[in-house]
Amino acid sequence: QTCALPISLYGVQTLRAMENFPITGVLLADFPELIIALAQVKEAAAQANMALGLLDAKLGTVIIRAAREVQHGRHHEHFRVDMIQGGAGTSTNMNANEVIANRALELLGYARGSYDVLHPNEHVNLSQSTNDVYPTAVKIALHRAIASLKDAMAALVGAFLRKGDAFAPHLKMGRTQLQDAVPMTLGQEFSAFAHTMQEDVDRLTEAQALIREINMGATAIGTGITAPAGYAEQVRARSEEHTSELQ
């Protein structure tokens, strides 16, 4: 079945996903952190493929340029798939592949959709699978989001502690089972809020350490099948460079 594409950087795979999975109305475009992370993964993959001689330098260069434009906040309106979809993020991965491929084609002077020149799967997704691209991008985006959340929570911890000091002289009744129980100070209550919040910050720090482990190069089922020798090491090294602030 043929599909009429609107004027857009995404392609037919994205359009079909939009038609097949209109589930929540919450779109990939609503999560810029994830889009940026996907573009960083695509850049790292292109660099690795170029280093191994698998991707023509001319094509690789424009793929990287297009991916960097996305990282700088451009073209996000073309990431239109629903966040809830069939598969393991395949539609999200293809949305990224098509946007980057079509923008790269424009940079080469070709019309969008000239996939005989530069293809979303054959070039942008070279040596990759949704099953390593998507979880890696999600982890990068989550790591950054957690960092921002921790900053906000740390500020709240500080505010609770200050109130704990300010309210130290003020007595109140502690309550259990919806009844007055024994006395405490209002300062103790706010200090307890601070302690509980700090424990949550510490748990988030532990979670950040766990999600720094990525599976780029493992491809579809974790064995690295279809990825050439040396690719996994190359793409992980490039990914580390692009996410150095997370180290």
For each predicted feature, which ranges?
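Conserved, well-structured ligand/cofactor-binding cores
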Residues: 1-240, 244
